[in-house]
Amino acid sequence: MWRLKLSEGDEESVNQHVGRQFWEYDNQFGTSEERHHINHLRSNFTLNRFSSKHSSDLLYRFQCWKEKGKGMERLPQVKVKEGEERLINEEVVNVTLRRSLRFYSILQSQDGFWPGDYGGPLFLLPALVIGLYVTEVLDGTLTAQHQIEIRRYLYNHQNKDGGWGLHVEGNSTMFCTVLSYVALRLMGEELDGGDGAMESARSWIHHHGGATFIPSWGKFWLSVLGAYEWSGNNPLPPELWLLPYSLPFHPGRMWCHCRMVYLPMSYLYGRRFVCRTNGTILSLRRELYTIPYHHIDWDTARNQCAKEDLYYPHPKIQDVLWSCLNKFGEPLLERWPLNNLRNHALQTVMQHIHYEDQNSHYICIGPVNKVLNMLCCWVESSNSEAFKSHLSRIKDYLWVAEDGMKMQGYNGSQLWDVTLAVQAILATNLVDDYGLMLKKAHNYIKNTQIRKDTSGDPGLWYRHPCKGGWGFSTGDNPWPVSDCTAEALKAALLLSQMPVNLVGEPMPEEHLVDAVNFILSLQNKNGGFASYELTRSYPELEVINPSETFGDIIIDYQYVECTSAAIQGLVLFTTLNSSYKRKEIVGSINKAVEFIEKTQLPDGSWYGSWGVCFTYATWFGIKGMLASGKTYESSLCIRKACGFLLSKQLCCGGWGESYLSCQNKVYTNLPGNKSHIVNTSWALLALIEAGQASRDPMPLHRGAKSLINSQMEDGDYPQQEILGVFNRNCMISYSAYRNIFPIWALGEYRKLMLSL
């Protein structure tokens, strides 16, 4: 049976692997009854996979209940009847909160974080399989049990039409259909395998024009595998890394995720690396295309992309650019004497890859460049220590649930979840009962702050100084994020006001100051905050976005979510410590508020770039404005934002926003006007803090009723539709949100009731 291991490992670590989570298969773990129960959970997911596409993380919950939950007394469940919203009393809310916290405490690890599923995208796992196959370590790295779960996951998320979406809830795309099909074939699936699933996938591919219509990232992976020709790719010249940094399109000016993906891609492209050909690859050349492989016009194929994948079509200028580079630039760079320049560029690129690997302890900033960097290390030296170090960190990205084994969008969301959970628990005022949860979470925050910059001179490697920041996940992944740092600072400051015997010693003042300095260093001239770094170039550069599938990837844009979080963290810090850089901090806050005001949309909302979508960003927009001292009465922006949220409340009392809002940039309800507990919580939190109770408390009562009645028998909340997003078009799962935000919203609602 699969078992989650926590904070373990022999690899190098800055904090003894605090926060690490990985699954191992243990033949001795679990009784026959427990194994039968796990199989029942799997079967139930498969049976309902088309109506409920999101797993509920039931394997981890089962393990926690087995190890910590047995014998724990359950409080009776409470419900609020229709029409009795005004009669909700403190006892009803108290019971609901205690049941929620009791359940959530079982899920917390000893090191203070809450392990969980951070999956959703469907292009990550196939890329890993291809990468391991190409490096000839697939079966040695992914055991038979791993491959069983990977097959289960891929088949569970195949759509009825035979294809796979960009994410678990998405319509079928050529990108993920081809890559998923290829991954299954590389793991030994036959042409007619999966009870017809393979044939169905092949039919989808052929019906939509064949694999020449896969977008550029897919063309790249197929070329590495040898199932597509490099001449069918648009150029990825590594020489870009040799250009002067003063140029606005230098790779070092790009958003870090973008440049860290195209960095190893340029190495493999520059080497024109191709896997050793075998019978399976030759067969794939026949299976994936509608015409014989040797008849394909690869130059035409360069710019072909299925309409299902085309979220960001190439502007004409981009096609002209790639054609010129392909026709004139590449032939010159492949011949003497300019081939010496290419060799120098390839060496430079590998130096950047090694820098990223070593400073991130071979975790890397994310799963895409993790696999690409690993492959580059193998191409450079197949028996290198760098490659071996990469292999030992693959498990950090894999998660097992009832739908199978997936590759997560990061090595987890540990720090982010902890910072939000702390604020949620504090909002309940039940600290005397659940102080141990806070103490452990406090330790996690203290243990994961980045205490030094990356090695050498970070600027030479286009890295922003990171001392004092917090990353999204663990201390071993040292890419600090603006909102993660701000939320961690806020949580640490709130905990510093609590009794030491309950929550532990506060963070040292020096560490808090480092966090403030890091936040201040990230503010752009327009007052906004981007995600990881300062915005280094111009939005117009999006014209060279080559991905087709993702939007807004070229530079690190400013976001209302990050800007609001920065305001909140800085305001709380200067409230508690008015002597440190007060003038600079106040100036920063004022500029940030101006940015939020300017980016508000005419209907009163803000567009969300990291959560779904207008509800999420509007919560942040309101929170930032209120933290700065604005009020409903004094701010037209806040009044418009509250009006927007109230206009979206559903008949059932809740709110429910579809991921299509992110994709189409138009507010869209969930199908059937269904409510969502997390959207409802965000809206309630915003309205409560903006003083809605003094104007008309009924919307709050109705929203609270929706949350109370959604709680499950064991104190958990149901997993509903996907709520995370990145790059406008790809959704990702935040499995902890279903617990954190109802607790937070009902905690604030309880405080509101006591004040009335």
From Swiss-Prot:
GO molecular function: lanosterol synthase activity
EC number: 5.4.99.7
Record-linked PROSITE patterns: TERPENE_SYNTHASES
Positions annotated as PFTB repeat: 147-188, 512-557, 589-629, 638-679
Family that this chain belongs to: Belongs to the terpene cyclase/mutase family.
Superkingdom assignment: Eukaryota
Cellular component GO terms, alphabetical: lipid droplet
Protein's gene: LAS1
Keyword list, A-Z: Isomerase, Repeat
Keyword Repeat: yes
Annotated knockout phenotype: No visible phenotype.
Function: Converts oxidosqualene to lanosterol.
Protein name (database record): Lanosterol synthase
Active site residues per record: 483
PANTHER family: LANOSTEROL SYNTHASE, TERPENE CYCLASE/MUTASE FAMILY MEMBER
